[in-house]
Amino acid sequence: MNLAPDSLFSCAGQVAIVTGAGTGIGRACAEALAAAGARVVLAGLADSRPEGAAAELVEQGFEAVGVVCDVTDAAQLRRLVSTTVERWGRIDTILANAGAALDQPGADDALERMDRMYALHVRAVAALAELTLPVIADGGGGAFLVMSSLSGLRGNRVLSGYGVTKAANAQLARNIAVQWGARGVRANAISPGVIATEFAAPITDDADAAAARLLKTPLGRFGTPAEVAGAVVWLASPAGAFVTGQNIVIDGGTLISD
């Protein structure tokens, strides 16, 4: 194996699909995969403008395409996969990143909210796996990555349904690792802590909430989308070729703090 960083962490020749790729962590991960040499399909809801994000990558000289896709809609998910295969003939890496925190303490529809998060964080990921794992395996193997959360590893006062469904999708990644490892597919979950994005603004933009969280974070700061994207490139590249069935925590040490 070539141990030079530009080879060890290269995704050249790969085709990657990133869901929830129009903004935030998903967009940073798509950009990092493209910079590492992958051809990237950026999928997202219409209001996140995945086509615009892809167009910016193309302007920079990368190969990318944007697809409007609600991953909870089976027909749209099938179209996403077929569009990718028709365009580039293969799939090597999946990052199932689409997500939403819909919990609202005291809400009368708490169970309905949990159902919606289950559909997004678990069922949609399972459906994407069903559509893409055979393609990845037939192409010689690759990486199926699931964006989980620190909330799936800790008890939560507020993010109850979010934490439950994120814990479930990390388990789904472990199951895929066992079921598909013999065909060359690696599956891992990634669990970010608080990352400075619009999604985390209720914590990062609230002085009291931010201070309370940082007291529990040994590194004393919030993470950046690029720091999550670095792990995605690692797991998709030759550098991550012997890593599977893991839940990679990127939280500045919050989980292990006393």
Predicted feature residues:
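Substrate-binding pocket helix/loop in short-chain dehydrogenase/reductase
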Residues: P105-Y118, R213
